[in-house]
Amino acid sequence: MHSRLKFLAYLHFICASSIFWPEFSSAQQQQQTVSLTEKIPLGAIFEQGTDDVQSAFKYAMLNHNLNVSSRRFELQAYVDVINTADAFKLSRLICNQFSRGVYSMLGAVSPDSFDTLHSYSNTFQMPFVTPWFPEKVLAPSSGLLDFAISMRPDYHQAIIDTIQYYGWQSIIYLYDSHDGLLRLQQIYQELKPGNETFRVQMVKRIANVTMAIEFLHTLEDLGRFSKKRIVLDCPAEMAKEIIVQHVRDIKLGRRTYHYLLSGLVMDNHWPSDVVEFGAINITGFRIVDSNRRAVRDFHDSRKRLEPSGQSQSQNAGGPNSLPAISAQAALMYDAVFVLVEAFNRILRKKPDQFRSNHLQRRSHGGSSSSSATGTNESSALLDCNTSKGWVTPWEQGEKISRVLRKVEIDGLSGEIRFDEDGRRINYTLHVVEMSVNSTLQQVAEWRDDAGLLPLHSHNYASSSRSASASTGDYDRNHTYIVSSLLEEPYLSLKQYTYGESLVGNDRFEGYCKDLADMLAAQLGIKYEIRLVQDGNYGAENQYAPGGWDGMVGELIRKEADIAISAMTITAERERVIDFSKPFMTLGISIMIKKPVKQTPGVFSFLNPLSQEIWISVILSYVGVSFVLYFVTRFPPYEWRIVRRPQADSTAQQPPGIIGGATLSEPQAHVPPVPPNEFTMLNSFWYSLAAFMQQGCDITPPSIAGRIAAAVWWFFTIILISSYTANLAAFLTVERMVAPIKTPEDLTMQTDVNYGTLLYGSTWEFFRRSQIGLHNKMWEYMNANQHHSVHTYDEGIRRVRQSKGKYALLVESPKNEYVNARPPCDTMKVGRNIDTKGFGVATPIGSPLRKRLNEAVLTLKENGELLRIRNKWWFDKTECNLDQETSTPNELSLSNVAGIYYILIGGLLLAVIVAIMEFFCRNKTPQLKSPGSNGSAGGVPGMLASSTYQRDSLSDAIMHSQAKLAMQASSEYDERLVGVELASNVRYQYSM
């Protein structure tokens, strides 16, 4: 209730700028320069406590005035809110409205105030449109034109038919006003003739809820276990409170009571958190059908106008729901547009119809004297305080009133038409029952021209149609009309050869044709297939006979007996026709263009590991190399002291002779050098060898170095094993990468557009869904309706031509069928978004429904439905359905080209580096011998030459051979000495 008041207050705020209130300036009125064809004043009078009706009036005014592109005029409203039924005060207020130059009156007042307003309306011939009034002062047979028109239809006959529908023989009538007593009189007069057993058991006028509960206690004392059928004729809020107090009262029973709410109170909001509403039998009437397009558009516009801060403070309908509009508010909203249509009709025939009146009223300036302006008295503003002894009616009042009776529009309360007496005709009421959580379930439909039409067989119903439906009796000799439409693979025209004549059902083939044959065999009936005339499945259409088009409309109009096609079972269709058990289960799926298979790249061998892992491996390699270098600096086991030979010992060792060269001996005074094998370059070389799982000449002897090496080995063996396993799959299996894989992907990207069939069942599913993902998809599709299509063929063509930039939301059977047909360039991705089914449709109450249900279940259990589906979907496929995508292929050169490139590049790099080293070595300048200048470092007799010669390529080779020979002929420490000696070798060549 609080959220509803907030919304009403918000509408009050947004409409204030478009509506003139009683406090207005006559000077501002005189400054207006627009013509009457652009502005028409209206007077409105409301009783206090009618906030929802006032808000509906203001919103209707705003809705019309904002429609600048199509409206012919603008409405101005002068609104008065009264809190008294005093006739004198009300008369002054009415006269004040007349003096403002209004063209019609609107409002909602109490029955006591209505009599005064009604009298003034007829006296001054001022049209008065109201959502409801109790009883007309003028009888229809009086022959006089009544200038008051009520938007609320007469529903006392609906009460009578509902009582008969439930089979009640007695009722208890509770009412709160004189109007209710008059309705009781009409009910009694209609029911009594020919139904002597019917009786009104008790009648009680109640003033408040307490009085009603006390009366119920009296009924309980008189007969606790007797059935009590109570017709409750009171406002909605009082009816709600009575029911709540009844259920909470432990002294009152529940199962023995059944309430029939006579007013249109079921359109009001009934909170779902009040569990008492579902604990007792409640039946009522609704005039606002939420499935009508006009009502949906009204609620959509209300959502757009709703403040964002109130979105979470709504009722239990959900965070995005809005309070239900009451019947009185809907009728007030329709009243404004009835007047708008009447003025449009007048201005279409004669655009300047009101121009003279407007100029004369403008020049009158609100004065009661017309002589000053030179205008005709009949054209002046209406004056209630005339002293002439007679009243002057408004000259346009009769014309407007007669045009009002000819208005035909579609409003929130359904089709709006009037008879010559101004009474609503051709209207529809919904008979609903309330269940748990205040859920309303429609059980029947009442029309003023057809009476009560049950939607389903009811326990209390005794109609022959319901009886036949329950027993399943049908005429087996009758040829039943089966409505369908052409859509592969469900139904198509059979291709015939030359000279072949196809007639009747033999002209068709497809899944639905086979299904119809099997159902006819199960039921033992004959049938004839007829294509639906408009080519539609069936949607609500106010311009179609019966309110629906397509196959649904044909079933409603009894033009067909059965409909077999790919028609989805929906709650909206179930309201007007019957469905069998689903013969096919499906869901909304995503169709995209099949992506081109990716050919392996040159460096496809890198694909098994992501880019992040490769970067991590490189960083790990560098890090381990640095760690090895540093941890081998500190332990003493990584260092070896070279034992240099002394002067006395060196003389005993003969110089080494290699290739005619004399190996000189080092000087005794050179200090010892502690060498370490793990230099920076050797550390990197060791880490690389371990990573490549190859050997290396050096190993860390220290514990720290070996720990570092061990963890690096463990790391590499796991990484190499994982890489090898993934590499096999990446190199031998070709893959297709789709841009969209799940429905969530659609909402998280902007490259791929998507849509569905406009106004189809998929469109309605997203519009009604309250799931967050579906809401995002609906907002996108509703804002980009150009991405949706009018036919599935158009959507499939767009998918194929979009180069992967368009996705179509289509039912899964259609998706699978198209994917299995040439050119085989589409595919289904992701899971189904919802679950629904196709069903065989029949008119409501058809005797075939029960047997069709049994037949469908039988065909499903024995596998016939699966067989014919495979026949039309997969057995005739011309595509491979991507079976090759999971089959390993032999490796081609393109799969491993990258490693050849690396091999060739590495070899070329090695050759280039070798050449560079050679030239750099040859360009090294000559070095003086340490002993050539007679210094202490000289060693006489070591070599004949006192200087190093530039080494030739053969010199370098002999240098390496000497080093290897000495390493192989000595122990570990002696090897180190040989290495040191080899590093100081001098060669002397004989010339």
Swiss-Prot record:
Cytoplasmic side: 633-710, 917-991
Residues exposed to the Extracellular side: 28-611, 732-895
Residue ranges crossing the lipid bilayer per the database entry: 612-632, 711-731, 896-916
GO cellular component: ionotropic glutamate receptor complex; plasma membrane; postsynaptic density membrane
Predominant subcellular localization, coarse grouping: membrane
Region (Disordered): 300-321, 354-379
Membrane topology: Multi-pass membrane protein
Organ and tissue specificity: Central nervous system.
Glycosylation sites: 67, 195, 208, 281, 376, 385, 426, 437, 477
Entry's Gene Ontology BP terms: modulation of chemical synaptic transmission; monoatomic cation transport; synaptic transmission, glutamatergic
CDD domains membership: PBP1_iGluR_AMPA, PBP2_iGluR_AMPA
GO molecular function: glutamate receptor activity; kainate selective glutamate receptor activity; transmitter-gated monoatomic ion channel activity involved in regulation of postsynaptic membrane potential
Biased amino acid composition, Polar residues: 308-318
Signal peptide: 1-27
InterPro entries recorded: ANF_lig-bd_rcpt (IPR001828), Glu/Gly-bd (IPR019594), Ionotropic_Glu_rcpt (IPR015683), Iontro_rcpt_C (IPR001320), Peripla_BP_I (IPR028082)
Biased segments, Low complexity type: 365-379
SMART domains recorded: Lig_chan-Glu_bd, PBPe
Sorted UniProt keywords: Cell membrane, Glycoprotein, Ion channel, Ion transport, Ligand-gated ion channel, Membrane, Postsynaptic cell membrane, Receptor, Signal, Synapse, Transmembrane, Transmembrane helix, Transport
Family in the record: Belongs to the glutamate-gated ion channel (TC 1.A.10.1) family.
Function field: Receptor for glutamate. L-glutamate acts as an excitatory neurotransmitter at many synapses in the central nervous system. The postsynaptic actions of Glu are mediated by a variety of receptors that are named according to their selective agonists. Forms ligand-gated ion channels which are activated by kainate.
Subunit architecture: Homooligomer.
Protein name: Glutamate receptor 1
Organism of provenance: Drosophila melanogaster
Organism classification: Eukaryota, Metazoa, Ecdysozoa, Arthropoda, Hexapoda
Gene name of this polypeptide: GluRIA
